[in-house]
Amino acid sequence: MGRYAPIDASAPPLITLDDFFTPEACARVIRDAEARGFEVASIAYRDGTRVDPAARNNARVTFEDESLRTELFERAAPHLPSLHGERPAGLNERLRVYRYEPGQRFTTHRDGWVQRPDGSRSRLTSMIYLSEVEAGGETWFPSLDRGITPRTGRAVFFQHSLLHASRPVIRGTKYVLRSDVYYV
């Protein structure tokens, strides 16, 4: 993880797309993630990666799936803005599924960017809600005074530097497919 890039004010800080993924596709990703097995999610800090339950207490599974990654990018690309004079080039190879059960959350933070050896770097966070919850679990953006409610198949793309949090799930289980959009 790197430093935080400034927000590109010429582009929307947040894009929401309903029905981005079908309920059947969402269910398949959840089944595959459960079969892979979840672990406690860690956080990448400047001095290293560690589990920090005071900041984050959800579970995560990380995997690579080239066909899923390609499908996600092809669906997203027409909706993605140029940022800092660069264009979208693809998604991170490492896909993550997050699972939030009642009481689990991720406190307010910014997503760090990653730079590849080819010079491309991540600038946007990609999140697809794979499930809905009965209560809680919103993704909260304090600077926008806006919360996004989990809805099966809803995609959210936002600039890495946009402050956000996953509010605690109260009832139900929230699953999110997470990646990063690389730019060149």
Regions found by a protein language model. Give the residues of each.
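Fe(II)/2-oxoglutarate oxygenase catalytic core
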Residues: 1-125, 129-155, 161-184
